[in-house]
């Protein structure tokens, strides 16, 4: 399967305008691992998640198959960027305490990617992918937002649809 780079043309705009995740997410991710030596942010894009993870991990290895995305990634002393596919990372075996993916998992070849995650995760490491982890975080961190949105909709007469 050949990588089709759909993000190079607008990589500067993507880096400038992509919304960020709440700071509580990064603290929660860090709380899921006993060690904090190495994180791998796969499909890093502009490095947004990688830079935040650098506040919790000594080293962050941030990869993306798009050279243009990496070229526009935010620099940080603890983040090392590499142009690599998700399915073939340059980290050694059992070297990562945490593996994250922001909004890129749907682009990956799942079987090959999860095999790579299993290879690079050290014992006790965490890779909180999937709906369960997202749902748990979402419930805890955004409940107040949706409560406020419902209240605001009731006051203004607008109806929010999902």
Roles of regions detected by a PLM:
Residues 108-116:
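A short, conserved alpha-helix within the catalytic core of class I
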Residues 19-37:
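Conserved alpha-helix/loop element of class I SAM-dependent methyltransferases that forms part
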Residues 87-98:
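A short acidic, Gly/Pro-enriched loop at the edge of an enzyme's catalytic core
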Residues 118, 122-162:
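Conserved catalytic/acceptor-binding region of the Class I
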Residues 40, 46-88:
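Class I SAM-dependent methyltransferase SAM/SAH-binding core
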Residues 101-102, 110:
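A short beta-strand submotif of the Rossmann-like class I SAM-dependent methyltransferase core
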Residues 6-19:
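Class I SAM-dependent methyltransferase Rossmann-like catalytic core
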